[in-house]
Amino acid sequence: MRTSQYLLSTLKETPADAEVISHQLMLRAGMIRKLASGLYTWLPTGVRVLKKVENIVREEMNNAGAIEVSMPVVQPADLWQESGRWEQYGPELLRFVDRGERPFVLGPTHEEVITDLIRNELSSYKQLPLNFYQIQTKFRDEVRPRFGVMRSREFLMKDAYSFHTSQESLQETYDAMYAAYSKIFSRMGLDFRAVQADTGSIGGSASHEFQVLAQSGEDDVVFSDTSDYAANIELAEAIAPKEPRAAATQEMTLVDTPNAKTIAELVEQFNLPIEKTVKTLLVKAVEGSSFPLVALLVRGDHELNEVKAEKLPQVASPLTFATEEEIRAVVKAGPGSLGPVNMPIPVVIDRTVAAMSDFAAGANIDGKHYFGINWDRDVATPEIADIRNVVAGDPSPDGQGTLLIKRGIEVGHIFQLGTKYSEALKASVQGEDGRNQILTMGCYGIGVTRVVAAAIEQNYDERGIVWPDAIAPFQVAILPMNMHKSFRVQELAEKLYSELRAQGIEVLLDDRKERPGVMFADMELIGIPHTIVLGDRNLDNDDIEYKYRRNGEKQLIKTGDIVDYLVKQIKG
């Protein structure tokens, strides 16, 4: 490709509304342009990267035995009503009617469509297992699209769905997809972790996320410092303290705390160790309960894990925190004065709280706290559960080492769905015994556009993007200095351009009438891994300057050796 025949829309300045580095660099490198909130046009450089990602995904999915299909973006509402997700999905599901007043949705995912297809196409267990995938546009009406293509409303996704007659068969395909995803992200040169995860609104049982480690990530990824254990923070188990509860050394006393509405204020005003405080959060109880609310207690320096809390049998789903009005109607005190003593509703305490002694908590009286509370002496020990987020330094749940926490960008997610959708849509085949058998399903997603942004978040410097070779828009940049004035430079540039292309190497020849500084800056911004610079001074010695983008190292290579050198660098 020649720059004179290419749209090289680079920007010198960083757009003001671009928050994260990938968004900034994708705009500056001329990869994307914003059309509307959460909607982006992909320019030629961006499309080249996108296609590289797609091709790797497609190759590994095919190698794993998956079959490619293509399903409509627009889906009839009746399928979503049949599955029960019409009500469950909420405002992220864009709903509309056609001219015949028939309701439709723009697909955020395709479980319903593929299940409908399979229930009409398959009839016998002999046709299974099968795994179908597509690389298709999705739309989710995000309340606040941000970070460029990292959290956009329209995006490209690889979604796959497998169908089985047994859990064992599903497990085989699930393991194959796990391995395929590991190959995909390894081939792309990404530093990632596969972590245990919650199934969320998709549903099902087992689930793993593939997280690219990056400071800008929205997820907390938890992993052991000595073993292979890794999990999303939502799912990571907080192990109960090994040390037995210390004996009481204080009497419980009622203390006036009129200006301490938060744990931070209580700690500061009364010089308490935060580890000796407990915070009490009230949430709505499950429908049909004899109590409207449930009290959840965690240590003052810990955070409630809402995913774990929502799974408690007495807690309503989705998890809903009580309003101050609802709290006062039940407890007769405000949110800043709540605690376990004389709490008139069911209480669930975290494992760490169960191990505490001589602690401080609200007295369920406005402006008052109890200090020196001890379980079983001052209040009976309530139900104990793991309801907090783990913190760095906690013991690993597998018993090996301690936990580290890093930020991650979710680029892939695999689920064992079980029979959630096949039961709802009555997708079955004739089993080996001649009876109808509901299908068991798995689903497997990769955010193709998000992968591009995640790769940049891991691979950049002060000059621009530093692409991993496998997904770079071009492999080699040829920068001829003053080629429009030097016939020798121009002739060699054209010769090398042809020879490299003949070797199957993707080349960008910068044949613009631009200053060398502009040419260098653009190529480094775009992030092309290998650059060769042709100039009369070096050519006097039959030399060409080669520069590797990742480490910035330069070297002189003889003109006759440069093609072989580049082929070896790129193809090994």
UniProtKB/Swiss-Prot annotation:
**Keyword tags:** Aminoacyl-tRNA synthetase, ATP-binding, Cytoplasm, Ligase, Nucleotide-binding, Protein biosynthesis
Subcellular localization is given as: Cytoplasm
Domain of life of the source:
Bacteria
Q: What InterPro entries does its record include?
A: aa-tRNA-synt_IIb, aa-tRNA-synth_II, aa-tRNA-synth_II/BPL/LPL, Anticodon-bd, Anticodon-bd_dom_sf, Pro-tRNA-ligase_IIa, Pro-tRNA-synth_IIa_bac-type, Pro-tRNA-Synthase_IIa_type1
Single GO term (MF):
aminoacyl-tRNA deacylase activity
The Gene Ontology CC terms held by the record are: cytosol
Question: According to its UniProt record, where is this protein mainly located?
Answer: cytoplasm
Q: Name one GO biological process term.
A: prolyl-tRNA aminoacylation
Keyword set includes Cytoplasm:
yes
EC no. given is 6.1.1.15
Task: Supply the Pfam families for this chain.
Answer: HGTP_anticodon, tRNA-synt_2b, tRNA_edit
Q: Reaction catalysed?
A: tRNA(Pro) + L-proline + ATP = L-prolyl-tRNA(Pro) + AMP + diphosphate
Q: Name the family.
A: Belongs to the class-II aminoacyl-tRNA synthetase family. ProS type 1 subfamily.
Function of the protein: Catalyzes the attachment of proline to tRNA(Pro) in a two-step reaction: proline is first activated by ATP to form Pro-AMP and then transferred to the acceptor end of tRNA(Pro). As ProRS can inadvertently accommodate and process non-cognate amino acids such as alanine and cysteine, to avoid such errors it has two additional distinct editing activities against alanine. One activity is designated as 'pretransfer' editing and involves the tRNA(Pro)-independent hydrolysis of activated Ala-AMP.
Annotated domain remarks: Consists of three domains: the N-terminal catalytic domain, the editing domain and the C-terminal anticodon-binding domain.
Q: How does it assemble?
A: Homodimer.
Name recorded for this polypeptide:
Proline--tRNA ligase
Lineage of the native species?
Bacteria, Pseudomonadati, Pseudomonadota, Gammaproteobacteria, Enterobacterales
What gene is this protein a product of? proS
